[in-house]
Swiss-Prot record:
Name of the molecule in the record: Magnesium-protoporphyrin IX monomethyl ester [oxidative] cyclase, chloroplastic
Organism of derivation: Euphorbia esula
SUPFAM superfamilies: Ferritin-like
PANTHER family: MAGNESIUM-PROTOPORPHYRIN IX MONOMETHYL ESTER [OXIDATIVE] CYCLASE, CHLOROPLASTIC (PTHR31053:SF2)
Biological process, per Gene Ontology: chlorophyll biosynthetic process; photosynthesis
Function: Catalyzes the formation of the isocyclic ring in chlorophyll biosynthesis. Mediates the cyclase reaction, which results in the formation of divinylprotochlorophyllide (Pchlide) characteristic of all chlorophylls from magnesium-protoporphyrin IX 13-monomethyl ester (MgPMME).
Length: 405
């Protein structure tokens, strides 16, 4: 069964940004969009939509990525003829959950969306477009991966295949809803162009399990935390998409539960020293990426009344507690030194960004980057080598999910 979810902590006053108005200070005017209108691209780009400007993504290390895997190995792992001990009953129970489709009628828009978008002006409007764009890209990435897994596993394990197909349904629904949101701002992501043009990152199946489990669970905690914060502080409810996060996050949670079941079905991914090292590596990768990403976009979180770093640490801690129920080892993220290391990484990353924005030639820029990259790697390695927390359970004790809204 899925791991029992820890209760989210009440949002404390320090969690909320004390600024009650969104000022147009100079730091907001320098924010750069990670997408550019198609009209600025080469002639190979897709024609602009009649409804608005199509957008394509500029790649950076922190951009949401598209993943692929060894589908042949995945077929072997879940082949019911080869692996007689697979816990098919758990997969069948999960399948019924997905078939119920709790959110089938949830993602219905109303006139509030366009009205809110029209009221949003200045830097906050620009930042919000970027938020929708990045979120849509991440959801669409999940759709493509799950769809292909559903197709490839049909013959070897129809139950697992159908769950992947139903998860791709959820991700497509999320991506479409977010893209509709972009249309409120007179933009749209060209998802067909993205499918063909984006670079795909290859991960072996066990790494897909680690990374995707963390991605889904951290998504749950991000969405539910934002939802609860805005429910308590409605004056920051600048766009109605946040009102959908309570039900939306349960899709993320169910997806994470499924990946938990997949890992339990392959105990070799969880019960040796190598699994402990990889588990810590993926925890650190996901947490650092989120922290650096969000600290580049503090204006967005300030715009909805959140303190970016407090919000991120809250999400990291809750995700880590949840992850500890399945991963054999996790990071000690509640050690104050862990946050200090993250904050030092933010400072180094800001310096790296500043180097990239100078007018120096590429050789000079690269020379300036070398000591900064070395310092960043040193901080990441030091965080990885902090004493971990032994966790998980090799006998996979079953936990009943207890979700509190």
């Amino acid at each position: 069964m899925a791991a029992e979810m820890a209760l989210v902590k009440p949002i404390t006053p320090k969690f909320i940004n004390p600024m009650r108005t969104f000022s147009s200070s100079s730091k907001f005017s320098t924010i750069k969009m990670s997408a550019t209108s198609q009209s600025n691209t080469t002639t190979t780009a897709t024609k602009p939509s009649k409804k608005g400007n199509k957008k394509e993504i500029n790649e950076t290390l922190l951009t949401p990525r598209f993943y692929t895997t060894d589908f042949d190995e995945m077929e072997t792992l879940f082949n019911t003829e080869i692996n007689k001990k697979l816990n098919q009953s758990e997969f069948e129970a999960l399948l019924q959950e997905f078939k119920t489709d709790y959110n089938q009628t949830h993602f219905v828009r109303n006139k509030e969306f366009k009205e809110a978008a029209d009221k949003m002006q200045g830097p906050l409007r620009q930042i919000f477009v970027e938020f929708l764009e990045r979120s849509c890209t991440a959801e669409f990435s999940g759709f493509l991966l799950y769809k292909e897994l559903g197709r490839r596993l049909k013959k070897t394990n129809p139950v697992v295949a159908e769950i992947f197909s139903l998860m791709s349904r959820d991700e497509a629904r999320h991506a479409g809803f977010l893209n509709k949101g972009l249309s409120d701002f007179n933009y749209a992501l060209d998802l067909g162009f993205l499918t063909k043009a984006r670079k795909y990152t290859f991960f072996k199946p066990k790494f897909i399990f680690y990374a995707t489990y963390l991605s889904e669970k951290i998504g749950y905690w991000r969405y539910i935390t934002i939802y609860r914060h805005l429910k308590e502080n409605p004056e920051y409810q600048c766009y109605p998409i946040f009102k959908y996060f309570e039900n939306w996050c349960q899709d993320e949670n169910r997806h994470g539960d499924f990946f938990s079941a997949l890992m339990k079905a392959q105990p070799q991914f969880l019960n040796d020293w190598k699994a402990k090292l990889w588990a810590r590596f993926f925890c650190l990768s996901v947490y650092v990426t989120m922290y650096l990403n969000d600290c580049q976009r503090t204006a967005f979180y300030e715009g909805i009344g959140l303190d970016t770093k407090e919000f991120d640490m809250h999400v990291i801690i809750e995700t880590n507690r949840t992850t500890a129920r399945i991963f054999p080892a996790v990071l000690d993220v509640e050690n104050p030194e862990f946050k200090r290391k993250l904050d030092r990484m933010v400072v180094i990353n800001q310096k790296l960004q500043a180097v990239g924005e100078t007018e120096d030639n590429s050789v000079v820029k690269n020379l300036k980057r070398v000591p900064l990259i070395a310092a960043l790697v040193s901080e990441i390695l030091a965080a990885y080598l902090m004493p971990p927390i032994e966790s998980g359970s090799v006998d996979f004790a079953e936990f009943e999910p207890k979700l509190v809204y």
